[in-house]
Amino acid sequence: MSSRTLVGLRSTTSTHLQRSGVAAAAAVSSSSTSSSGSAPRRCLSSASGRQVQQSAEFSSSSKSWDRLGRRAKEKLLDREFFLSLLNSASTKREAKSYLARLKAQHQGTPPLKPAAKQPGVAEAAAPVSSGASSTSFYGASRSVYDSPVFRHDSTPTPPLQDVSERLHLALVKITTPQLLDDSTVNGVAKTLSQLNRLGMACCVVVDPGTAGDSNQLRRIAAEQADRISTAVDAQPDSKSAHIDSVLSVSALNPEAPKVLSRKLLLGPLRDGHIVVLAPIAYTEDVPRAVTVSASDAILALTKELAGLATNPDPDEDPIRTAQRIAGLQEEVSLDRVILLDPLGGIPAFSGPQTSHVFINMEQEFDDIENELLRVWQSAASAKNNLPEEGLPSIADSNPLSKFADTEVVPVPPSQKAYSSDLTLGTSMVEGHINNLRLSQAALAMLPSASSSIITSPLEVANSAQSPGGASPDVSAVGTRRQRNPLIHNLLTDKPLLSSSLPLSRRAALNGRRDSIATQPSHTTFVKRGMPLTIIPNPWLSPWTAKDRPRLGLDDPSIDLPRLVHLIEDSFNRKLDVQDYLNRVNGRLAGLIIAGEYEGGAILTWELPPGVEDDGSEASQARMVPYLDKFAVLKRSQGAGGVADIVFNAMVRSCFPNGVCWRSRKDNPVNKWYFERSQGTWKLSDMNWTMFWTTPGLTEDSQKFRDYEAVCRSIQPSWADDTGVVD
């Protein structure tokens, strides 16, 4: 992975960073874990005049560091960067998925500049971004584009066009940074620098909180913006830009700031700077600085960057208006909205989990919001401090999710307060509600591929440090570092922990269940997501063998052609549709569909061979809840949380008392099944492994034999009878 380094050329710096980024991702794809001796040299940008600096985990007084030469320091810093990437994407599948997303950015790349060609030699047809960030590797480097390629036939030269590379951006809100120590701020700055190097430009908004008057908050915000900017500048090959005068407010609507200058904001981002903003806006009539809500600033920036802030002229042709908005959206892709809050991710107070590691907004927003509101109401009621007019301003702060007083679900008498420190507890719940609503409001303006991450600055900073905080030696072997939630999410588009993992298989959690103050919250990954359809509705009628529906897959409420396509695409086999319908119709327990048939599960009630289905209680007691088909479209596998959404619906809503299924012994998905099942059993003389989520199954010998008999007896319904055991 060696490359030539030309110091002082900005384009060469971009070339090196692009190559090093792709090399890092490729290293993950090949499962390489060695980085010493193969890391490329780091380039210095003459524009900043900055010397190579040591990263946050190196001690400035370290004698071993001082003895290293410049090139050795460069290699050591690059090794640290690559190790962070290798640790964040732990599987080849995750790395390949990331590389595929990068490749998709350049399908249909346009034209290049005209150039004279020698006979038999043609130029590589690809554009060079004139305004690309010097740290982006979403596009190939200039030297790659300008390299001649051997070609027998001549290649027509496309016309010259000025094509700018699309800017990929993360919008970051850091809450109360004045309460963070320097080590945490430096760790956050290091992660932002790594994101920038990976091609994800960062725009940071400082949130000073609400403790203090307007003048105090404005002073704190400006000081903390300078502090974060200084921490970013201290990172190797990293530059910041603390920008004022980006936001403005009108006298008619002082609570709705808007972006004053799009160019002022995007210019430094395209130049590779990490932009830092304070939530300060200027009035339009008489220029005067006023403090605005950091959440309102985030929404204003989101609206502008999503291309939705334009005010079309009523006389303008609608087609031209649409083209202008589309052009703005092509300039920038706001991929992430990151909320760094000391509170951490969104906690959970129902079910076995203690925090939400993944939220599908389309499906879960209302339920989670109601749950948090009940917790707030319970804590406030216990302190006899519930306002007579209903909930406080948090219930009305988000115009996209109004929650009237009458909609608040009454607190059951048996429900106790969730925190011993009720003043602290209510304020913390308000913070979680605001984070949830801010994520929902921002994602509502963005494409479905965008996402939000809610985590704590401490978790990001800790994962940015080397294990033990010691200065790493070139040949040192140490403890595996904690995965960085932001880097991991960029590479995998997934949360650190799968939401469908049983609690027993997650990292050990400390703290009491009924205390917000002591309850640790994992990082929460939020997607606008997809709707979830369950037929029949388990909340109206629980799925039981006695009340099983008279439902078939050819029911009008089911789109059978799309369901068949989902199964065939997922299994990569043709289904004998009529044979399959004959087998499952009459046994169907229900159907789970995620989104527009992007994923799904078909569940049935099965009887062991020899047991007659006569409708008796004895027959119903022997029925086995069975997962007949679990399918996810290939394009949705490995990312987006589709499988987790379907699996969670199955085990939490449809069959909370347990379900079983079977899989080929050599199925690569079995590892995923192993992690989510209560137990497994390899069927002798067959190529099947049985899985179940039923608690205590092995203690009930009759039920266990029924499960095994069902998994042995079901015949596949594939049209391509290749003789291969399914």
Swiss-Prot record:
Name recorded for this polypeptide: Amino-acid acetyltransferase, mitochondrial
GO biological process, any: ornithine biosynthetic process
EC identifiers of the protein: 2.3.1.1
Segments of this protein annotated with the region Disordered: 1-64
Domain N-acetyltransferase: 547-716
One of the record's GO molecular function terms: L-glutamate N-acetyltransferase activity
Function: N-acetylglutamate synthase involved in arginine biosynthesis.
InterPro entries according to UniProt: GlcNAc_Synth_fun (IPR011190), Vertebrate-like_GNAT_dom (IPR006855)
Family: Belongs to the acetyltransferase family.
Gene3D superfamilies per UniProt: 3.40.630.30
PROSITE patterns, sorted: GNAT_NAGS
Predominant place of localization: mitochondrion
Pathway: Amino-acid biosynthesis; L-arginine biosynthesis; N(2)-acetyl-L-ornithine from L-glutamate: step 1/4
